[in-house]
Amino acid sequence: MSLRFVIGRAGSGKSTLCLREVQEELKERPRGKTILYLVPEQMTFQTQQALIGSEEVRASIRAQVFSFSRLAWKVLQEVGGASRLHIDEAGVHMLLRKIIESRKEGLYVFQKAAEQNGFFEHLGGMIAEFKRYNITPSHVYEMWQQLDAHSSSAEQKLLANKIYDLQLLYDDFERALIGKYLDSEDYLQLLIEKLPFSEYVKDAEIYIDGFHSFSPQELEIIRQLMRCGARMTITLTVDEKTFAQPVNELDLFYETVLTYEKVKQVAREEKVVMEKTISLVEQPRFHSPALAHLEAHYESRPNEKFYGETSIAIHTAANLRAEVEGVAREIRRLVAEENYRYRDIAVLLRNGESYYDVLRTLFADYDIPHFIDEKRSMSHHPLVECIRSALEIISGNWRYDAVFRCVKTELLYPLDVKKEVMREEMDEFENYCLAYGVQGKKWTADEPWTYRRYRSLDEGNEVITDRERQMEEKMNRLREIVRTPIIRLQKRLKRASTVMQMCEAVYLFLEELDVPKKLEQLRVRAEESGDFLFATDHDQVWEEVMNLLDTFVEMLGEESMSLSVFIDVMTTGLEALQFANIPPSLDQVLIANIDRSRLSNIRATFVIGANEGVMPATPTDEGMLSDEERDVLAAAGVELAPTTRQTLLEEQFVLYQMVTRASEKLYISCPLADEEGKTLLASSFMKKIKRMFPNVKETFVTNDVNDLSRAAQISYVTTPEVTLSYVMQQLQTWKRYGFEGDLDFWWDVYNFYVTSDEWKQKSNRVLSSLFYRNRAKKLSTAVSRILYGDKIKGSVSRMELFNRCAYAHFAQHGLSLRERDIFKLDAPDIGELFHAALKKIADKLLREKRTWADLSIKECEHLSILVIEEIAPLLQRQILLSSNRHAYLKQKLQQIIFRTSLVLREHAKASGFVPVDLEVPFGMGGKDSLPPMEFTLSNGVKMEVVGRIDRVDKAEDESGTFLRIIDYKSSSKALDLTEVYYGLALQMLTYLDVVISNAGTWMKQGEVASPAGVLYFHIHNPLVEVKGDASEEEIEKEILKKFKMKGLVLGDADVVRLMDNKLSTGSSDIISAGLKKDGSFSARSNIASEQEFSVLQKYVHHTFETIGKDITEGVIDIAPYKMGNKAACTFCHFRSVCQFDESLEDNQFRTLKDMKDSEAMEKIREEVGE
């Protein structure tokens, strides 16, 4: 056995020399002894192509390209040992999950870590690392003993505990595998054991190419190959000059030199004959002087500058998308103008999770065939999600999110239904489940579900309509479609006594759902749409899931396992599934990660994402062991994978290999902002290249072509799909500013689209948006009548909504749009409860001919409990009875009603006003309803304003009878005359108008009532700040102040004293008014004269008539109001409908000026002519 090294810098022809030797040997002796060509896994396909790609060698049996793992498979097939089942990454994770669950109580560190994302990936990686470095469970145990004996600090104790846990888990893992299964590292260990018995390898010519380091396990394989083979050639990327002096860890080729010495040591131990090392000094790869200079002087300090013509380009981009589009345009140019093939080009990157989706999308748009050398997770495939969410439903008590994740995979749908119809029905079904809070036992109970449209607390709920019955039947039918297969799965899993029976339950679940047929439908549909990558996904995922179940059964089939552990193990396995990469076609751009890629025969390389922290990478202390812990183990003589510090030192070699891949052109780029617009920095690596090549001018890549030259803009004309967006951009520019100079070629591009039979329809649809104006066209009279009827009947809040935004009114009352109902307690529900509770108490007092003042504190508490218990079953589908949390909330609401009752009691004691009616309807029909406020509009349409008044109070004195309105609010509110002027606050004055106009309801025939005011009563249970020694009476007084009613009252001192008989001078604690010593009102008093109330009444009528006329004439302008920090859009549900956008010319807020009450009153007078 002899050993020969072939060394040389990148591009010196090491691989070419080896391949030519093999090809010459095959040409001369095609049937000689075996030639093994060992390369890293990523290089096998392209090396095989290179080996048999010459004119002389079209095929070969004698020479084979292997990775170490593929060689293991080949040898085990020959000499035996491959009968043990292979366990893949998913199987490893499942087995480790099972071991963790059984070992939990005995672990020190990893007891709770199993629930962290990525834990099993790290744990599996740690065990694989142990194996690669020939560390057995007994070695790990010895490590623990040594560490435990010398642990004095908390950090040392933590490491000892961690090693103890790892030893237990590793030992259990190995015991589970022994004699039955092989993981990837076991194959290599078996290869070491079986190589001496292989006739295939005996006396083989062995080439090892493309490596710059070997793990101890790989070195052991090399040792065995030295014993079996006839001759071994190993290529290493290293400069011969490096051996002339001692190397240190900062040298570019430090790692390679270490590898060279390790292999030589193995050769010495095996007494292998050392042949003369072949040192290659030429650079045949580089056809570009600049790239040759970059390779030759990459590590030079200071940087050797190159002033000649360069084939290196450096770009910064506005964002990631602009960067990738710039790459795509240049690739198309190289292919079109410089005779490149797509296979001549590679795109290299590091942070693939940020780039892969963008690359797939944009390269498809630019018609660039490409291959991404990266495995994709199966986690998001419908089949994997269906199984995972079904198991989560069972383990998580049928939670809403798990149920509808499962539903949205569409694998629960019956096979023969129309998907479009079923999707719509399932959307309705989801809305029902959200509205009724369906989860848990509601899914599995035998009782059918009920459906009732929402009714107020005053409406009866006994009679079911035909519409409700139909919806009920539909909801129960859909319920069975969803729950039946999952309940069957649940029952089978609970009955199962072994893992095999549990896996069988999952298999039957999928078979009974006709999943194979449904996946076949998806595959056919993907093929028909030309998406062949995703078409193969559907075949792969079924096969992988079946393999997963088989592996589970093979490993643990006869074991008993709790349902929760089974679900955890199964979920862990599902999360580890990955799609296999389809080998690239003969002409595709290769997209690869710089850490794992091994490229050859590349003419142009695009390095993208060269940002600070990425190239070179910022070390991340991930994995089971930290750098400090690895250093401790290294000091104890334990060799493991490099620390992040060592990895960082190797970064320069990784980057060196990256920039020396191409023979002709190198492009380096980075975005200056991420997807969220945050600033990114160019890397120090880019700056280094710029220093080496001063003549290279950094260019900026943008998606906005307006500031570019004509030549640069022409480069943006690529595929029709992509160019259409740039035509849009340019026509927007032309629309605003016109074209200047020689940019009128865009009209030629435009003409292509509008005259092309293939693109005319799509371009018309896209380009029509150029003249889009987000305006709502006025409705015709006919459409307005259809939507609103021949007679307008609406509440005051509807009229206020129109003045806030006419389009929001149209969406809610014309189109009848509404948010979907969610099973939760919102502010309107709480407000409704408060109103109903106070009404019930007040009705009881009226029936008993008592007032609030007659109630004791104990009665207030008793009544608050009584009414809440009565209302709770009727509110929002019994939401207050649905959970312990809502039961607690019910108690808090009862306390608010209790507090409010106490305050109303105090108000009643201090007031000459008494409630005479509650929840007074007007325009609602029925004997108890007051008539509506009626209008005949100028266009002849009749309009009625209707509503319900919370409370009407009456007081009498020698000057007459007075009526006032009290409105209960669950938030603080005051009457702002500016809002009255703009028609945004009409409710209270309307109510006052209605009761004054219908005063006979509460008075003797012929008597006239005067307006006393309108007041808001804030229902709440306030907190107050008091001194530590405050008495209970003082605290109650402070609380009472928090209930001061705001609004507008009659500017009559006697009437104000009727509202607060304790008021002589100063501010009232009950209403927002105060008196000076001379009997006049204080400046802060919110008062109006009787004449002003009359003016306000006229103005409200005038405003309603204006609103009614606009509604009937079809005004639906997208014109939300804005006043100060208030805006109609703030809480609007219809923004996604109207698409209001301030950047559009037609979309601007209707800005309203805030005014003092006196100024607003003056404007109101002007409007009504007084």
UniProtKB/Swiss-Prot annotation:
Cofactor(s) needed by this chain: Mg(2+); [4Fe-4S] cluster
Job description of the protein: The heterodimer acts as both an ATP-dependent DNA helicase and an ATP-dependent, dual-direction single-stranded exonuclease. Recognizes the chi site generating a DNA molecule suitable for the initiation of homologous recombination. The AddB subunit has 5' -> 3' nuclease activity but not helicase activity.
EC code: 3.1.-.-
UniProt KW Zinc keyword: no
GO biological process: double-strand break repair via homologous recombination
Subunit-structure text: Heterodimer of AddA and AddB.
GO molecular function: 4 iron, 4 sulfur cluster binding; 5'-3' exonuclease activity; ATP binding; double-stranded DNA binding; helicase activity; metal ion binding
Keywords: 4Fe-4S, ATP-binding, DNA damage, DNA repair, DNA-binding, Exonuclease, Helicase, Hydrolase, Iron, Iron-sulfur, Metal-binding, Nuclease, Nucleotide-binding
Organism annotation: Bacillus cytotoxicus (strain DSM 22905 / CIP 110041 / 391-98 / NVH 391-98)
Pfam hit, one: ADDB_N
PROSITE patterns attached to this UniProt entry: UVRD_HELICASE_ATP_BIND, UVRD_HELICASE_CTER
Ligand binding (ATP): G8, R9, A10, G11, S12, G13, K14, S15
Keyword Transferase (UniProt): no
Annotated protein name in UniProt: ATP-dependent helicase/deoxyribonuclease subunit B
Binding locations of [4Fe-4S] cluster: C805, C1129, C1132, C1138
Co-factor note (free text): Binds 1 [4Fe-4S] cluster.
InterPro entries recorded: ADDB_N, DNA_helicase_suAddB, DNA_helicase_UvrD-like_C, P-loop_NTPase, PDDEXK-like_dom_sf, PDDEXK_AddAB-type
Misc note: Despite having conserved helicase domains, this subunit does not have helicase activity.
Boundaries of every UvrD-like helicase C-terminal domain copy: 281-587
Family: Belongs to the helicase family. AddB/RexB type 1 subfamily.
Domain named UvrD-like helicase ATP-binding: residues: 1-343
